[in-house]
Amino acid sequence: MSNLFTWQVHGDGMTLQPGEVVEPDERLTWPRTAEIGAQHVIAMFGATFLVPILTGFDPSTTLFFTAMSTALFLLINKNVLPSYLGSSFGFIAPITAVTTANKGIAVASFGILVTGLLLALIGVLVHFAGAKWIDIIMPPVVNGAIVAIIGFNLAPSVWNNFKVAPDTAIVTLVAVLLVAVLFKGLIGRLNILIGVIIGYAYACIRGQVDFSAIGDAAWVGLPTFHLPQVDFTILPMFVPVVLVLVAENVGHVKSVSQMTGRDYDDQIGTALFADGLGTTIAGFGGGSGTTTYGENIGVMAATKVYSTAAYWCAAGFALLLSLCPKFGAIINTIPAGVLGGVTTLLYGMIGMVGIRIWVENKVNFDKPLNIMVAAITMIIAIGQFAFAFNGISFNGIAIGTIVILVAYHGLKAIGKATGTIDKNDPDIL
């Protein structure tokens, strides 16, 4: 254990020459390392606090569990893989569906807990059996569609917030876009956070912010924890999120490998297990589910500091913020107009991540099988198809996921059996 928390000081610990990098098992001086850790908190914060705000979860509780999950992640991978675990946007749709049905946060927490357990189980399987079977079950056309529908299914909820205060929503959205295109480096990557701050300031001027809860909140205190309430009927809404979390974690590991020049393929199973365990714990205590964050890859790309020590500092800062109820109360005052503006971009970007999976993997939509199963899945999600069977509810995401998995593999098997699909066709995996 003592070796686990021993990092070699890089150079003089203070300065870095152009192009020089700090490896995961190295660190700068602790003040410099803490500075990098603070940058990681700022980078992840814009996305992390939006998830509880949009779903009705407590921001302080969610932040607390992101800190715990990050620490757990680093412990499990023995400080080899630098990552921060923030709130996953994949949970917004199923949580919203549950709360809209008046089943409450406790029931949604059960869905998060089970999702985490399933992800941890997949992590164990990948660790011992490899990740090839994931590619077989979820080829790019399937993987991309599932990720895309998580975002596009949320489009109606964006409008519900947007129409409350269209002027504030537009100001927020324009601010996010301008920061993204006018600034480079860390500031440009903080476009969501800065845009929300600008939109919030505008909302304050317009008298759209209720500050009453801030004065009643204490400066120091524990977050609000609550136990999950068992309800198996909501699980079909959450199970598809497991596939999204698998895709996010695998993509994250490969991105870090490419950036650091290290082969982290042997860490994929560990990453999935650690994120699954963190999500399970969060669900047990009333926090939102977690995932590895691309925002923090941006910080590493900008600073060239890959030290896992910086992520321990980030987890520490996040923990301290979660223990300030007044801070959580401030976050809860963000008005609907601001949320409508920022989610217009965010939910669309989640959907476009799925499209990017298609593009990067050169999915051939000249093949009828590929384009038909993708088209059906997208319409099911965007149209928000829904039905119930024996008391179990299926929303657009659950139905779309089932349809594309069954349709793709079923039709592929029929096509290959009848000879209409070449068994060696590289475009039909």
Predicted segments with their positions:
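Intrinsically disordered, low-complexity non-transmembrane regions of multi-pass membrane transporters
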Residues: M1-E35, F211-T224, Q258-G261, A271, ...
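N-terminal signal-anchor module of multipass membrane proteins
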Residues: M1-S83, F89-N102
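Juxtamembrane interface elements at the cytosolic ends of transmembrane helices
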Residues: D12, Q17, F45-G46, V174-V179, ...
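Membrane-embedded helical hairpins/re-entrant loop segments and their flanking transmembrane helices
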Residues: P18-A34, V51-L74, V239-T308, P426-L429
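Hydrophobic, membrane-embedded alpha-helices of multi-pass small-molecule transporters
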Residues: R32-G46, T168-T172, L190-N191, R206, ...
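Short, non-helical or kinked segments that cap or interrupt transmembrane helices
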Residues: F57-L63, N79-I92, W133-N143, G188-I194, ...
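Interfacial segments of multi-pass membrane proteins
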Residues: I95-A101, A180, N296-Y311, F317-S322
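Membrane-embedded alpha-helical modules
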Residues: N102-S212, L320-D422
